[in-house]
């Protein structure tokens, strides 16, 4: 019997795949557990429509990420912190602080987990910080840390 997998089934098939399986296995396990549906022409059409929709959404997300990348690379985030001699900061600048300043100064909301700061910023001056907007799109954000008076 041909079935369309709704979820990944180890050793049998991945979500969205159409495969031939034993009738008993399909009726007694896959259908009852909600892991698959019968591959009727109507169900196959619905699956193809859903795949097209997901493809369109993925393309839109990629376009939005590229647009945001352009915007972010034009911006310099200005932060001030208390510093000691030689430009060393008391404390550090974290990705959370950078995200908050982006929100307050530029009205751009970015999750702090997308800001890939290997180590917190501990010195004055300019720092280039990578921001992963999409698996294929990474922007570079300029962060300028000045001394707080």
Swiss-Prot record:
Highest taxon of the lineage: Bacteria
PROSITE patterns in alphabetical order: RIBOSOMAL_L9
InterPro entries listed in its UniProt record: Ribosomal_bL9, Ribosomal_bL9/RNase_H1_N, Ribosomal_bL9_bac/chp, Ribosomal_bL9_C, Ribosomal_bL9_C_sf, Ribosomal_bL9_N, Ribosomal_bL9_N_sf
Single GO cellular component term: ribonucleoprotein complex
Pfam families the UniProt entry points to: Ribosomal_L9_C (PF03948), Ribosomal_L9_N (PF01281)
GO molecular function, one term: structural constituent of ribosome
GO biological process per UniProt: translation
This protein's UniProt keywords: Ribonucleoprotein, Ribosomal protein, RNA-binding, rRNA-binding
Job of this protein: Binds to the 23S rRNA.
Family label: Belongs to the bacterial ribosomal protein bL9 family.
Protein's recorded name: Large ribosomal subunit protein bL9
Organism ancestry: Bacteria, Bacillati, Bacillota, Bacilli, Bacillales
